[in-house]
Amino acid sequence: MPANQRKQTSQSSYLQTPRNTATPSTQDAGKSVIAPKSSTSDSSETFLTMAQTTTKSNGQLPTPSANINGVPPTVNRKKQKRRAKQAARAAAEQAQGSQTNGGPSPGDVKKQMQELEARFRETGLDEQYDDDEQLDPAEDNAYYSDEEGDAYSGSYGHDGSSTNGYAMPTTNSSSKKQKKKKKSKSSQSDNSNYAHHGPNGSSHNHVSLPIPLQSPPNMQRGPGISKEKIWNTSSQEERERIKEFWLSLGEDERKSLVKVEKDAVLKKMKEQQKHSCSCTVCGRKRTAIEEELEVLYDAYYEELEQYANHQGGDGPPPMMPPPRRFGAMSGLQPPNRLPPVFTGQQPSRGRIVEQLGDDEDEEGDEEYSEDDADEDDYSDEEPEEIPRSHATDFFNFGNSLTVQGGILTVADDLLKNDGKKFIEMMEQLAERRMAREEDAKEQYANANYGHPPNGSMHPHSHGHLHNHPPPPEEDDYDDEEDDEDEYDSQEEDYDEEEMDSMTEEQRMEEGRRMFQIFAARMFEQRVLTAYKEKVAKERQQKLLEELEEESRADSLRKAKKAKDAQKKKEKLLEKKRALAEEKARKEAEKAAEEASLREIEEKKAEEQRLKREENRKKKEAQKKADEEERVRKEAEKQRRLQEQRERQAEQERKQREAKEREKKEKEELRRQALEAKEAKEKEAKERREKHEREKREKEAKVKADKEARELQKREEVAAQQAAVQAAQSAAQASRRPNQVPTPNLSHVLASPHISVAIPAVPKAPTPIKLRTNSQQENHSTIPRTPSGIPQSPFAGMQPMPGGLQPGMPMVPPGFGRPHHDPMFTHQQPIGNQFRPLPIPNGGMPQFQPGFNMHHMPQGRGFPMHGPPGFPQPSPNGMGSIGQLFGAPKEAPPSQAHSRNQSGSFDALSSTTQAQPIARPAPIGRPSSIVHGARHGDKSSNGEPDESSKHLGSSALLDDTDEPLKVGMGPRRSSAAPGNSSRQNFLPPPFGMDRSDPAGMMSSFGTWGAPPNPFGSSSLPGSNGFGGGWNTSLNMNNSFGMPPYFRPSQPRSVAVRLMICMACQNLQSSTPDGWLDIDSIKNEVALLNPPREEPVSERELLDICDTEGNQMNGGGTFEIRHSNGKSQIHYVSDPTPHDFRAVGAPGEIGSPISGNASRNPGPPGRAPIGGF
């Protein structure tokens, strides 16, 4: 299609469709270059890039301007905009006509611009500006303006023309609709887009710098805006300041800014090529790229310096050498480039958006995206592909440098697109340079050189391939409405000559020019950033100055307020001072009057005082005479009373002396009588002791001889009995054993009193002791052992000699053993040689043989025995079970007399004759002296006991002092004569009450001794435990221990014994022996019987003050008080007491024997309680 036809079609399409007036005539298939919206104000005029009215000398149009007066619109806004667009198109047509005729002069350009401004004022296109001749913030913040153009590198003169003679085509932009806000906004663009449609429909645009129109120095500012006001400045002022800032920088500062930008680009280039191959060709290419960048940046810096140095000259210095101009007027067309729709007019569909801040970026992005979505309609139809050479890809670099919401820089391309386009451009520049060095003058259409058109593989001579990713494919877009009108020219074919019209040098210069454009854009941002930092510092300083001014004004205001307050205070003081003077004057006058009155009153008072003084003297004389008379009478009375008291005291003294003499005489007589009595008692005691010693020696000798004879007899009888039992066992196995009745012999019943065996001991000297009042009770008698033991074999059990082996001696009588103990030390324990016992008549369950029987200590041929006077275990080892759980089948009749009958060999039945002969009872004291009996105890028949006639320590007890009966059960009563009835339940052990569970479950000794059948011993030397020597205080007692003290003792004696025991137990807890009274009290509470009253602290201290003796534990207590607490130290007697032999009698008439304890304690340990 001819050029005039394309021009007519284009114009008609603009006139017919108002919507498309804002769209470019050629739709970009790829990314479009966003040109900045530039607007400037010269005095009261602001140039808007809405239409092109004039052209430069190179045939391209400058930017028109519109005057902004703030005139309110009078007609519809849409109609006004439509008329303005039509006027702009008319002006564009005139401009095209003038270009074909050779171009206008500068005077014609100014004239046309003035006409266009007047026309804009008439149509009211200034409605988008506010009243103070500033752009609306929503419009001005999001885009570049002409005011910001002065911050650029400055390659333009004051008249807005390019300094390098290169044409600066501008685009016409119109208002656009937004989908959300439904209101129109206008955008301006200063860059021209040369649409190069390739075979695949892609296009690329050559971008030129915006035209920075500078205002003259005498430019007037808007009303209310001053240069010093930095908080609210217009874009024109900011542009001027950016320019001044750049010119004010020194050479080193400008060089550092350029160097920073160069280093950033070089660093990114090295990072991009870091992973490429390390061949020589690629290495040379990298080196060439770096050298090319160095050269380009050095040239760019030199041009910047020239611009800065020639800023004040008449004409602007050339920024860069004028390259070959490619365009309609020059007659040169780049390859694969379509001719423009109309000469010099190349609208662009995009804007260069500058990053002025976070809010501005968001506004710019939103407006750009909404405008594009609302304005541009794309079709899926692809234009017919036109074959092109791969060399034309070099000029596609500009198409990829579109950044929405940011600036158009080389750094943006490196960050957003990984620098692929820029790197490809630099690689091609390096290849051209290498080609020139090697004089390889090949054509660009040769496929063997460089990159293939659509591939990414380039072979090298060294035999390896480099895989370069292909450039991103660019979508082909087509405007549906402009498809018929504007793109018919794509069907034309271009000649090969036109494709090759650009020489290599022209392409290289074009590439360098493009790089300088991009470097200017990037450097522009550097300068703007530096300027913003400076402005921020100025604003910060201004803010500090304002704050300081405010603080200064505040301090002045406070000082003024303080000064006013001080003045008020002074006025108040003056007023108070005047009032005080007036008051003082009045008070002086009043005082003078009062003084005169007081003087008159004083005269009257003096007269009255003289009269009163005379009267007083008269009264005093009379009173003195009366007082002297009274004193004389009182002295006389006192003298008489003193004489009477002296006489009475003399009489009392005489009476007292007579009484004292009489008392001394009585005491002397009593002392003499007491000494005589004591001497007499001492003699009697010594005689008794001597007699007792002789008697004991004789008895021991006789007993030893008798025991030897009886032992021999028992051995013979035991041998005979074993032979008889062995013969009868076979005969009784086949028939039921007959119940052998037990003869009712009165002499075989054991005495109710304890029989104490007195062994033969050597005679020991008895120390002479004074008779004490505490030893007045009877001594325990030694009853005689009955001569016979009641035999009652278990029902259903035949006696048989179990566990006897041939050759073993017979067990003598009285040495019964449990079945599980060895008979002799060399014999192993006898197993279960007896079958389980049948249930006794009482209904009790069976117990295994050997329960509760004594064990034999190692190395002893016979077991330990119980106390004398009790039946010994049977020869077959079942004596204990028979005594504990089995009652005799026929109980022997009880004795009518309490005395034990002597053992005799009277006629017995055949069954009794077969039993072993009991050993004779030892010689003991008369049984009338009952062990442990007290005054007032009655026997079972209700008659007073003979022992109650003896005197003892109980005679000294007070009538109110009741003896303690803790643990004392009723005494066992004698069985009635002829009572042979069987008991319904097992009888308790001897000395234990059936009603007292504690007696049944008393403690056991650790030496295998049986439970103590007597309960707690009444002897003070006894440890109070059951059986033998046991160091354990707990003694395995399930129901509590018996009391450690004698139940019949007074409370003071029992408490002192417990205190002594507590101190001995706690002696090792303290190093110095001083014990806290609380710990002693707690220990005494543990020792105190459960039914006794607890010991208080006061009682404990009082009892510690008592003197110790053999009855109450001995020793002494030391008490001290520290920090409000009492501490006690117990000191025992220095010398231990001598222990008498077992059974040795005490003093005559004493109910207890001193130190005659059956179990004084284990060897090596002192008796409990200090005895």
Swiss-Prot record:
The keyword Coiled coil applies. Residues 1-29, 37-68, 160-172, 190-206, 895-915 have a biased composition (Polar residues). Its main location: cytoplasm. The keyword Transmembrane does not apply. Residues 315-324, 865-874 have a biased composition (Pro residues). Residues 76-86, 176-185 have a biased composition (Basic residues). Residues 125-150, 356-384, 472-503 have a biased composition (Acidic residues). It comes from the Eukaryota. Residues 1-238, 307-392, 433-510, 545-739, 863-996, 1139-1171 are annotated as: Disordered. It holds the Pfam family NST1. Residues 108-124, 226-238, 433-442, 545-717 have a biased composition (Basic and acidic residues). InterPro entries: Fungal_stress_NST1, NST1. Keywords: Coiled coil, Cytoplasm, Stress response. CDD domains: UDM1_RNF168_RNF169-like (cd22249). Residues 474-733 form a coiled coil. It is found in: Cytoplasm. GO terms for cellular component: cytoplasm. May act as a negative regulator of salt tolerance. PANTHER family: LD36051P, STRESS RESPONSE PROTEIN NST1-RELATED. Belongs to the NST1 family. This is Stress response protein nst1. The lineage of its organism: Eukaryota, Fungi, Dikarya, Ascomycota, Pezizomycotina.
